[in-house]
Amino acid sequence: MVDVNRFKSMQITLASPNKVRSWSYGEVKKPETINYRTLKPEREGLFDEVIFGPTKDWECACGKYKRIRYKGIVCDRCGVEVTRAKVRRERMGHIELKAPVSHIWYFKGIPSRMGLTLDMSPRALEEVIYFAAYVVIDPKDTPLEHKSIMTEREYRERLREYGAGSFVAKMGAEAIQDLLKQVDLEAEIAVLKEELKTASGQKRIKAVRRLDVLDAFYKSGNKPEWMVLNILPVIPPDLRPMVQLDGGRFAASDLNDLYRRVINRNNRLARLLELNAPGIIVQNEKRMLQEAVDALIDNGRRGRPITGPGSRPLKSLSHMLKGKQGRFRQNLLGKRVDFSGRSVIAVGPTLKMYQCGVPREMAIELFKPFVMREIVARDIVQNVKAAKRLVERGDERIWDILEEVIKEHPVLLNRAPTLHRLGIQAFEPVLIDGKALRLHPLVCEAYNADFDGDQMAIHVPLSEEAQAEARILMLAAEHILNPKDGKPVVTPSQDMVLGNYYLTMEEAGREGEGMIFKDMDEAVMALRNGYVHLHTRVGIATDSLNKPWTEDQKHKILITTVGKILFNAIMPEELPYLQEPTNANLTEGVPAKYFLESGQDIKEVIEQLEINVPFKKKNLGNIIAEIFKRFRTTETSALLDRLKNLGYHHSTLAGLTVGIADIPVVEDKAEIIEESHKRVEQITKQFRRGMITDDERYNAVTAEWRAAREKLEKRLVANQDPKNPIVMMMDSGARGNISNFSQLAGMRGLMAAPNGRIMELPILSNFREGLSVLEMFFSTHGARKGMTDTALKTADSGYLTRRLVDVAQDVIIREDDCGTDRGLLITSITEGKEMIESLEERLNGRYTKKTVKHPETGAVIIGPNELITEDKAREIVNAGVEEVTIRSVFTCNTRHGVCRHCYGINLATGDAVEVGEAVGTIAAQSIGEPGTQLTMRTFHTGGVASNTDITQGLPRVQEIFEARNPKGEAVITEVKGEVTAIEEDASTRTKKVFVKGQTGEGEYVVPFTARMKVEVGDQVSRGAALTEGSIQPKHLLAVRDVLSVETYLLAEVQKVYRSQGVEIGDKHIEVMVRQMIRKVRVMDPGDTDLLMGTLMDITDFTDANRDVVISGGVPATARPVLMGITKASLETNSFLSAASFQETTRVLTDAAIRGKKDHLLGLKENVIIGKIIPAGTGMARYRNLEPQAVNEVEIIDEVTELPDGFETEENIVLK
């Protein structure tokens, strides 16, 4: 076998008859499989050992030669070669067909490749191939047309008319083969090229298609007649196995049945030909042979599929490749792996961030070879076999060895569905008792895991390199930030939030208020002895707290609470003391009002201070982000563990419980509802008098009930007790929100009916009072819809992710700087008055293209090609700059990928992205993973203002990425100028908008009901929307440039996600949109050898033009093409990637005719052939490094952690 890592590329072509013979080890002549008495394969049958190799290792069929020493000998009695049985997976046979047979892929595919080559309609081809008509192959001197079709009757009449032998006409695949042999590719191509210069319309389209196929044959060196088979390959027997079941019966692959039919019919045809049987019988047999081969290659493609027992269609060769269960997706892209296990997960609150608990039984099985090696190395037993027995017996000595083996050996934990790269992370295993894996509570959010019965899989990286990569790149403590937006993904949740919230609460007048302590120990002692409470406001000497105080603050008394002293004790010393949950406190330090001036009375000062709100979930997130920015991963993960421990400890001490009495009831609820009832009555009266329409009445009623619910909500918030446990949970962000609270204590409000329309009758009760039977019934609609929506959404979102990954999987950071001379001008994204994404957010982590100057002073804020940090972005925006030209993925010149400068920082690390980062896959995951959080609905605007549906949520994202015609499409102008008039035409129920510009004027018809975006006198640019709604990107591309379309698509995707509260970095969407617009269609080939109408990559097009321009020729012209992600995936240069995505047979048919080469640039194609992927450390530039010895002495600070959680530094000298 060739070493898979030595491949440069992989090519697929049509197989010539000689090629098939060269693969074959012998002809299969009989349809038999195995002898039912001896269970040995039959000679010359489908499982013959002479052809395919021995069934047992190193043993011939008759048993004369056994053992490896006879390797390579062919037995003189039975003719079987002595070799491994594994060759039965690779040796092929063949069947010599007694009549040529057309290959169904090339005849039946769309478009029919045979039809285009011969310039015949698929209908005519079918009649000829299946013996319903004759085709003229050589008219000789008769007036018959070449390739004309005639029925049996017409044929006989012509024979009578012109005489026998006066012309040649045949039927069946043989006729087609003769015609294909006659095709002169060069001449046909020349004729078509001439024809294209004048042709137009349908004729032109057909000529372009035909030219495409003929050119493919010509360039690839494939011969058209190879589309008709004279010899049929038989795949190796172990790929179509036959196994004995318990009851002595056999289960065999369907392929054996299909091959058997072919052989039977082929043998019968041979006999009929020998006997000189009548023509009609031979024809019938040939037709049946053709149908049998069709069924073998692609059963069900033509006519009714051949069925097996229980009328189940048999699985043909094509079906073996297709779909989720096919070869590509089931076996090549998704293999099962050894050294893995799965179990239920349980919480491990005592673990460190980088640890996970592995049950002993699991660990011993997973690390068995490592343990066995160590047992032998220690001379406990002499050989591996004995070591294996020792492990399987569960000897006492193995446990200590296991402990040592797993030390420093990371394992990978994965939870399905793996929606983004944080779904697989590495941990150091810790042995535990029990049978459940233990998971650190903070990584749950990344995995989206909870402990209600979730299961996780565990994998062991084996090689040293794999362990090193797992430890350096995948350790859970490294994954602090979410790759989609660069915000921390490991924020404390639930109990941890609640504990820290309770700890940092303040209360006026608690015991011991105004006490002053010299240091933290004293405060803690007072707390333990009951002199003060956690929430008591006290004073403490600032110099006892190791914090970055100013000179002025150093020797003062700080007013804080005991809880906050404990909270700050776990924070890094360099961080300011956190007294109030504000950004100013976090970045600049404690405000002056909390310090006691000399001579002031502490109690008076405390009374004047307002009560601070405690630290909530989002404040903790901000603290973590700030710490990450300052200290990076090691310190952050240590802090997270301390936050977790503190949170759990204090939520346990707080002992929050919820009882029914904790749900307050709003006093004046009855009055609020009574008022609303009266208003609804007034609205109904207005409707009855005909003052308003039914739609207006419906909108007014639902708005009234919404207002009532909001009023109740406001009352609840105003009257809530900050120490109420439900309020604390809600306010801290630990669990629940105001909507849940108001359903418990206010009113449930309006519900949706099964058809999605909001019902006018609201549910007036809340859960505290209890619902009536009718209300209960109403509320079940909503609950049921919620469940079905979630289920549908999950599937939709998963499929979207799959398509996104497929289209961008080969986008990798390939170089440092592409040297582009273009940039992208960006501003903030807005929708009307609403800010969608600010300029500051968009600038952060990108490189500038041009110098940015202060608009007033003209001072340079940042030079060209420099990284914009968070602080720089803030400085630019604060200076009043409104637009900046940055380096963007849209304008990157790198082939097959992106360069570092156009991409910017890697959001997952906060540092500049590295060469080799698979940014395409990360982008796809970042857009797909939040897909489940988006809504499914298409909103009705209530039928009053407009009659268009506005698509939002997941359907809108799919609409954008598939480049579909949007629902509620906006009318756009092709003219730049002024809107001169808007006329209404009552007869056609339309409006006409007139735009006049310097280049001409445009008249646009818009529906009567559409909402106008422009007024008379407005200035509009090309491609501007005249009405509300979504612009169709393909129309926009026709009137504007590529960059405008890309910018529009980016903004549209951001609008959907941001409106649902999901933040995604621009660069991820840029990567995706760029993949949709990579291709151009050739309009005029000029002097290049490109074909008109061909779809090709923009880089290949530029290369072809460059060569022609250098030699002084006329360059080709082309126009950009916007493709949806599904189409873009299928049009990729890699046939392996496209075939494993969708439409497998079509992709392979096309690739074979073109003799396509796959250069293995993407990730999928390398996974398929089992080669290391060309991203990260798999890139060629990293694989081909030569290690070199360096003799310098290097001093490294090693950080080790002591049992008390504090760290020491030792200097280690490396020789």
UniProtKB/Swiss-Prot annotation:
**Quick check: keyword Metal-binding in the entry?**
yes
Task: Tell me if Metal-binding is a UniProt keyword of this record.
Answer: yes
Binding of Mg(2+) occurs at D450, D452, D454
Write the record's keywords in alphabetical order, separated by commas.
Answer: DNA-directed RNA polymerase, Magnesium, Metal-binding, Nucleotidyltransferase, Transcription, Transferase, Zinc
The EC number(s) attached to this protein equal: 2.7.7.6
Catalytic reaction(s) noted: RNA(n) + a ribonucleoside 5'-triphosphate = RNA(n+1) + diphosphate
Cite a single GO BP annotation. DNA-templated transcription
Q: Which GO terms describe its cellular component?
A: DNA-directed RNA polymerase complex
GO molecular function annotations of the record:
DNA binding; DNA-directed RNA polymerase activity; magnesium ion binding; zinc ion binding
Q: What class of enzyme is it?
A: transferase
Q: Which Pfam families match?
A: RNA_pol_Rpb1_1 (PF04997), RNA_pol_Rpb1_2 (PF00623), RNA_pol_Rpb1_3 (PF04983), RNA_pol_Rpb1_4 (PF05000), RNA_pol_Rpb1_5 (PF04998)
Question: What InterPro entries does the record point to?
Answer: DNA-dir_RpoC_beta_prime (IPR045867), DNA-dir_RpoC_beta_prime_bact (IPR012754), RNA_pol_asu (IPR000722), RNA_pol_N (IPR006592), RNA_pol_Rpb1_1 (IPR007080), RNA_pol_Rpb1_3 (IPR007066), RNA_pol_Rpb1_3_sf (IPR042102), RNA_pol_Rpb1_4 (IPR007083)
Q: Which SMART domains match?
A: RPOLA_N
User: Cofactor stoichiometry and binding?
Assistant: Binds 1 Mg(2+) ion per subunit.
| Named cofactor requirement(s) | Mg(2+); Zn(2+)
Q: Which residues take part in binding Zn(2+) 2? A: C818, C892, C899, C902
Which positions are annotated as binding Zn(2+) 1?
C60, C62, C75, C78
Q: Which protein family is it in?
A: Belongs to the RNA polymerase beta' chain family.
**How does the annotation summarize its subunit structure?**
The RNAP catalytic core consists of 2 alpha, 1 beta, 1 beta' and 1 omega subunit. When a sigma factor is associated with the core the holoenzyme is formed, which can initiate transcription.
Known function: DNA-dependent RNA polymerase catalyzes the transcription of DNA into RNA using the four ribonucleoside triphosphates as substrates.
What is the name of the protein in this document?
Answer: DNA-directed RNA polymerase subunit beta'
Tell me the gene name.
rpoC
